[in-house]
Curated annotation (Swiss-Prot):
Enzyme class: oxidoreductase
Highest classification ranks of the organism: Bacteria, Pseudomonadati, Pseudomonadota, Betaproteobacteria, Burkholderiales
Reactions performed catalytically: 2-C-methyl-D-erythritol 4-phosphate + NADP(+) = 1-deoxy-D-xylulose 5-phosphate + NADPH + H(+)
Coiled coil residues, start to end: none
Cofactor(s) the protein requires to work: Mg(2+); Mn(2+)
Protein name: 1-deoxy-D-xylulose 5-phosphate reductoisomerase
SUPFAM superfamilies: 1-deoxy-D-xylulose-5-phosphate reductoisomerase, C-terminal domain, Glyceraldehyde-3-phosphate dehydrogenase-like, C-terminal domain, NAD(P)-binding Rossmann-fold domains
Length: 398
């Protein structure tokens, strides 16, 4: 039976890759709703190609722009806007599958709505689990939703794990691989001079600017550890991080009998997306087959926590529990935005997050509203810290 998709965040890199896979298999997948924040022109192009029933954007002005262009082209797609519209298309009877690819905390409410509606959820939004892991996973279980991870690392672990729960499958630990980003071998003393363009030049993956910066600081890997804790039900001390510069092995599962299972593939997000879309079947993703002889060598090393303090901060937040992970995520989003706008330097990202975690008292959240309140409080603190920070050095010519 054909799957009907709501694609949250269709104009981002995950959205592009998802629609590429969808276009290859029109007999398997159709699109009910596409959503974007303010990239109206790209959304119009997608709507004209995939003919969704509904399109959602962030504000009224963008909605008017998109609607006018679609009407002029003869499209019948209904254009909505605002946070509630995101929730509505995520729980609508018009779709059975929700691809959650909105970056940041804005993706939490629609992802949670999809879980409470019992949808098949392809999760690429880390924040739903980082901010409110217990609440989200309870909703998945209580409402019969199906959760399929799309992040390459978590999808790799999913493929290497038994279908039973981890505690019944003889699993010793899971190992998330990380490329190390663009600064793995750079002299630590020079990181203070890093520019946004340098931080966004990932050596292997094509990603958006925010997640590229998170990869450069390795905050992305820290968030993935927290995400893995909730998806697979393992404590933090059974989740390792391993630097693997080639990005060929996407993650590994270590078993009690000494076996280690790994999932390999070329670094292309269409592979995990196609796996999750078609699961339990396999379909062509448009990705070249891996040529191990050409790669010839795979290398590994332990992460340098002094070089990547954001990774250490994320692991600490997971250990502390409570609202710490939500505060970590909120402070990081504010700090990364400030860095991309050249209001703070690269190393100030970790310093800002650390200051917020040390200032905001930790507590056990009392429901989703409390999580969102902690998120807002952490954002205010981060903004205040950044406002007092010294201006970054003048960007050098490269």
């Amino acid at each position: 039976m054909q799957k009907r998709l709501t694609l949250l965040g269709s104009t981002g890199s995950i959205g592009d890759s998802t629609l590429d896979v969808v276009a290859r298999h029109p007999e398997r997948f159709s699109v009910y709703a596409l959503t974007a924040h303010r990239n109206g022109d790209k959304l119009v192009e997608q709507c004209l190609r995939f003919a969704p029933e509904v399109a959602v954007v962030g504000d009224a002005a963008t909605a008017a722009h998109v609607d006018a262009k679609l009407r002029a082209a003869g499209s019948k797609t209904v254009v909505l806007h605002g946070p509630q519209a995101l929730v509505d298309v995520s729980k609508s009877d018009g779709c059975d599958t929700v691809v959650a690819a909105i970056v940041g905390a804005a993706g939490l409410a629609p992802s949670l709505a999809a879980a409470r509606a019992g949808k098949r959820i392809l999760l690429a939004n880390k924040e739903a689990l980082v901010m409110s892991g217990a609440i989200f996973m309870d909703a998945v279980r209580d409402h019969g939703a199906i959760l399929l991870p799309v992040d390459s690392e978590h999808n790799a672990i999913f493929q290497c794990m038994p279908r039973d729960a981890a505690e019944h499958g003889g699993i010793s630990k899971i190992i998330l691989t990380a490329s190390g980003g663009p600064f793995r071998t750079r002299e630590p003393a020079t990181l203070v001079d890093v520019t946004p363009d340098e931080a966004c030049k990932h050596p292997n993956w094509v990603m958006g600017r925010k997640i590229s910066v998170d990869s450069a600081t390795m905050m992305n890997k820290g968030l993935e550890v927290i995400e893995a804790h909730w998806i697979f039900g393992l404590p933090g001390d059974r989740i390792d991080v391993l630097i693997h510069p080639q990005s060929v092995i996407h993650s590994l599962v270590s078993y009690r009998d000494g076996s280690v299972l790994a999932q390999l593939g070329n670094p292309d997000m269409r592979t995990p997306i196609a796996h999750a879309l078609a699961f339990p079947e396999r379909v062509d993703a448009g990705v070249d087959q891996l040529d191990l002889a050409q790669i010839a060598q795979l290398s590994f090393e332990k992460p340098d926590y002094a070089r990547f303090p954001c990774l250490a901060l994320a692991l600490k937040a997971l250990e502390e529990g409570g609202i710490a992970s939500a505060a970590l995520n909120a402070a990081n989003e504010v700090a990364v935005e400030a860095f991309l706008e050249r209001r703070i330097g690269f190393m100030a990202i970790a310093a800002t997050v650390d200051a917020v975690l040390n200032t905001l008292p930790n507590r056990a959240p009392d429901g989703l509203d409390d999580v969102l309140a902690a998120d807002a409080e952490a954002r205010r603190l981060a903004a205040a810290i950044i406002a007092k920070a010294p201006a970054p050095r003048v960007e050098r010519t490269v």
